[in-house]
Amino acid sequence: YKNFISDPVRLAAVRAALASLPAVDPDEASSELRHGLKGWLALFESNIIDSDAARQLMGELIKLESDLFAARRGLILQHINEAGQLEDATLSMLSTNLSTNPSEAARKSSFEALISLERWVLEHGLLDIVRQRNAFARAQGFDNYFDYKVEKNEQMSADQLFSILDDFEARTREANLRALRDLSQAHGAHATQPWNLRFLVSGDVTRQLDRYFSFAKGLQRWVQSFRHLGIEYRGATMQLDLLERKGKYQNGFCHGPIPSFFDAKGNWVAGQINFTADAKPDQVGSGARAINTLFHEGGHAAHFANVTQNSPCFSQEFAPTSMAYAETQSMFCDSLLDDADWLKRYARNAKGEAIPDELIRSRIESTQPFAAWGERGILVVPYFERALYRFSDAQLTAEQVLALARECEQRILGVAVGPRPLLAIPHLLNQESAASYHGYLLANMAVYQTRAYFEREYGYLTDNPAIGPALSEHYWARGNGISHNDTLLSLTGEPFNAKYLADSCNQTVEQAWEEARAKMAAAAERDYPQPTAPDLDATIRIVHGTELIADNRDSDHAMCQQFERWVGARYPAPVQ
């Protein structure tokens, strides 16, 4: 694939084909041809390295990254689990333990594992990779790799990006500091220690919520919720590999090896889409993480399955597809999981009882004060990465990079060390995701702008059957043939606006609770229509490595039952 998209001969052929077209398209077929060729031009220009020197540097960079990832596969991290036992742990397990384990010593063991990972990546090639990335960017006329990636991925300069990020930082700074002060006053100075912070913010509530987020029921709730939203997959084939196992890549992701498009004869080529996670069903919090993964990666899959252009270049997930644009689709879907009316309709315990209002309020009381802090947990990454890639080669020492990480965490998060230390974030290691993390924050800004539009237009989001068709028409159909900003203009009627996310972060607990109460009251009175489609219009396989757990050859309902039985047979109920 990389050889194909980086072939300069193909780029020259596309340019020649475009140059041969008449200045004015005489008919629709010519217009469609021009449209498709422009899509291929954007793809090749985003991925082809014109300079011989840069091509050589890229080859060396790929080797450095391959060596690091090969070594990383052999690294075993350990922590103390819920039962007080030392166990091997994935990044997901470390994160969940930090949030939910009532033992401070156990939480600290997870944090220390992450700190050890920071030192490990610095000792196993990350510094050389940063130097090589900068050399590669300079060979193409950029000051550094961060500037290069922002220009390539988001079609804006780093200065333009930081005009947005600086504005958001200023809008949410006081809310973040206020939350930390209040937490320290309530729990003492130790509350902001990195192994305590996440637990005190949400740990006890997460444990109480756990019984309402059955891991085994997660698949069924995803299918039902997406059906009620009117989301369909246009005949796509999807394979979901959701559970952790040794040697598996430790970060959820979605990949489409066969992009969707209409071929030259006008026949529909449905997408083939795989997504993965590393859930541990018997760990507290795993059910909530699982359904978040299903909504998030399922949102990506819905996006790529619904790109209806005349070439596959428009529906593949790499450049020129903007990360922020792609993440808007997935993060919009997983944002619904925080809505009180969604929780009331779907979050149920083993007896089928709905989550009580009091627990929803407790969740808001626990999380709303730290809404700004949560978003700033994303914000800190681009501040760190921009400064990192501005370092000279001589400055790139382990001690200086660690000092930079701690300085950024103090300035943006307000704590000496973040609960997820910066250099333990896997996105920084991979060429595709490095210097791109800001895309998540830009996406969440677009998510809240999108949510505000649907709330103005319809009054609600959960199980609103108008949402799937609207997203398909305005956000998904044209794929990367339209800019992120233009998708927002198409649906909401206004350009990119960070105000909606900042306003949500700055809400008080009482304001957020009143909004939640209003949603629940309206939902109780609403007559929800039945889904118009009988299923998600997809062939779905649930696997665990090479083992087939369940599929929907009979029906989505049968698949969900198979999955539930499989999980129940292999994992005891999590500790409550």
Placement of each model-derived feature along the sequence:
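Short pre-active-site segment immediately N-terminal to the catalytic Zn-binding motif
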Residues: R211-S214, F275-F295
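N-terminal helix-rich structural modules
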Residues: Y1-W120, Q395, Q431-A435, L536-Q576
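C-terminal, non-catalytic "cap/extension" segments appended to globular domains
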Residues: L294, A302-H303, F318, F332, ...
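Alpha-helical recognition segments enriched in aromatics with Gly/Pro capping
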Residues: K265-Q272, N292-T293, E297-Q309, L343-A347
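Short His/Asp/Glu-rich catalytic/ion-coordination signatures at enzyme active sites or charged loops
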Residues: Y1-D7, G36-L57, L86-L122, Q132-T172, ...
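Active-site-proximal, well-structured secondary-structure segments within enzyme catalytic domains
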Residues: L86-M93, L127-D278, I355-T367, D527-V575
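Post-HExxH zinc-binding segment in Zn-dependent metallohydrolases
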Residues: L165-E174, A319-E358
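Post-HEXXH active-site segment of zinc metalloproteases
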Residues: S286-L294, A301-F332
